[in-house]
Amino acid sequence: MYHRINTYSYEVLSTIKPVHISEYDWLMDHLPHCKDPAYQKRYRAYWRMNAARLCPAYCTAYFDQLHAAQSRKIPLSALARTLYATPTTRTGKQSLQISFASKLLHMEDPHLPIYDALVRDFYFLTSPSPRQSLNGRINTLYAFYTFLEQEYQRVLTHN
């Protein structure tokens, strides 16, 4: 799988628009200002949080956690539980937003991987059943994330 990616690395990298790199760099450089509404607007657009139609209360809780992550390490499972406690919609619906949680952790430590549907599909992983308990879903996703951390380090170390 990686052999094919390495073979076509130029083509793969050429699909990344320069604006995506400069916006990522700006977000990383200005992370200490994550409580600023202007920063949050750019962050939400970059990480496609607006498409998820998250309610303002969830976004407030999210950026509070992003701010907290700058002074202490937050495990993914704890972050997922904390964010789950805040409804994601105005109607009070809660949902497990592990992708956004992984992006939050990545912002604080860019050596941490990002988990989203594209990554999940690349590795042929399957989402946990919504019939599983919250703890069961978090444990399944945490196992995926641990695998990604190990895989990320393996790729960086061994190409």
Stretches found by the model and what they are:
Residues 1-93, 109-159:
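An N-terminal alpha-helical hairpin/helix-loop-helix interaction module that forms a charged
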Residues 103:
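Cytochrome P450 catalytic-core helices
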Residues 106:
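Short, locally clustered residues in the helix-turn-helix/winged-helix DNA-binding domain
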